[in-house]
A protein has these predicted regions:
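Structural preference for solvent-exposed beta-strand-turn elements
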Residues: 2-398
Length: 398
């Protein structure tokens, strides 16, 4: 038994020791497949390497017939609960994540008995075998800090949140100087909520009228937890309960809880850059435009990825060339175009990203001239309560 400097010095000392010992021991029976689902649900938070080696473990907390599993990298925490078949002894231990996952992946679905055998090891027993693994004291696991009493709370339809993240996350930046650009802005208003992402070359807004607040609020969610949320919110989830303060945010759905630190910083005034008076309007089939851009961009310069749009009444010609390799391509498409003849250049990967992440049949592109941002949005609203728009900066062309 290790002695701690923080041990009580009065008559409660014996109780402290007994409690410390009890919490380190546990025994339960659980479905191996259900346990695998549980650990995989939180495994994305396990760091590959950490300054705190304890974070390379799952924290198991057994209370009654519920096993709570926690994984964290100190910035992001995932927690879920699963029901066990029987509990012989409650407790809390930290178990090695990789070894636990590797073992469970190789087991067919069957009852699995987990029991501590000493103050540093536990046994996983199944019908035809067993495995002994080390564990670590739960008190070594860092305390997880959630939101405080100032937190703003709201409910977000699960599918709308997934769609909003999927529609914007690809436009986030990797900017060490402006960390706010590395996340998605949740701009919450009394009439709607808008998710915004930008890397300065393109800006994407996803607005839903299903989420409102009594007063305006906002937070910036880093792309990593945003991507994990998109991946782990299942189709059976109906609502995500969100709480956020000035430092942290939590997302609760079903038996899963996600806690993460927010990006600290001020997001640019994105509404100021959304074009309002672009009068040259192109209406075209999204899939056909996407496929044409992909074909033509094969012959673009691989360093610049420049492609050119030549817009005239009734037609759009897309062209690209790489003088260094003496290759070029162009393709003309029928379209509906109302406006002045216009030639404008773009980086093909940005166009491809935006078009690939819109689900509409037809889209509208609005231009002012060859030097200012173009606006891209669905020609028809896919749902009355949701809308998406993209803004892309042009490039100078010769």
């Amino acid at each position: 038994m290790k002695f701690s400097k923080n041990m009580p010095a009065d008559g409660k000392y014996l109780l402290y020791l007994l409690t410390d010992i009890t919490l380190r021991f546990m025994k339960l029976i659980i479905s191996s497949s259900e346990l695998l689902k549980g650990v995989m649900a939180v495994a994305k938070a396990i760091p590959a390497k950490s300054a705190l080696p304890i974070l390379e473990n799952f924290l198991f907390d057994l209370k009654g017939n519920m096993l709570e599993i926690t994984a964290s990298d100190s910035e992001l925490t995932l927690r879920t609960q699963i029901e066990v078949e029987s509990t012989a002894e409650e407790g809390r231990i930290a178990v090695p994540a990789k070894h636990m996952m590797d073992l469970l992946k190789e087991l067919p679905d069957q009852p699995l008995t987990i029991s501590t055998t000493s103050d540093s090891s536990f046994m996983c027993s199944w019908a035809s075998g067993e495995s002994t693994l080390p564990y670590f004291p739960a008190e070594d696991y860092p305390e997880i800090t959630g939101t405080d009493e100032t937190a703003v709370t709201l409910e977000f339809p699960a599918q709308s949140l997934v769609d909003g993240i999927a529609s914007t996350i690809y436009a986030t930046a990797d900017d060490e100087i402006r960390p706010a650009m590395n996340g998605i802005l949740f701009d919450i208003d009394v009439a709607s909520t808008t998710l915004v992402a930008s890397d300065s070359h393109k800006l994407i807004c996803y607005t839903t009228a299903d989420v409102k607040a009594q007063e305006k609020a906002s937070f910036i969610l880093h792309k990593k937890p945003a991507g994990i949320l998109k991946a782990i919110i299942g189709k059976d989830a109906e609502t995500v309960e969100i709480a956020f303060d000035s430092k942290n945010a939590s997302f609760k759905f079903g038996s899963t809880l996600v806690i993460c630190r927010l990006v600290i910083g001020k997001y640019p005034k994105y509404r100021d850059v959304i074009p309002q008076n672009n009068s040259n309007i192109l209406r075209i089939n999204r899939t056909q435009l996407l496929n044409t851009v992909r074909r033509v961009s094969v012959c673009s310069n691989k360093a610049s990825n420049h492609i050119k749009f030549d817009l005239k009444s009734g037609s759009l010609t897309i062209s690209a060339q790489d003088l260094g390799f003496s290759i070029a391509a162009h393709e003309t498409m029928p379209c509906q175009y109302d406006g002045e003849d216009l030639t404008i250049g773009f980086k093909s990967p940005f166009i491809i990203e935006i078009l690939s992440n819109m689900n509409c049949g037809e889209l509208v592109m609005k231009f002012l001239d060859s030097k200012r941002a173009a606006l891209i949005l669905p020609a028809e609203e896919e749902a009355e309560s949701e809308k998406i728009c993209g803004i892309i900066m042009p490039i100078m062309i010769s």
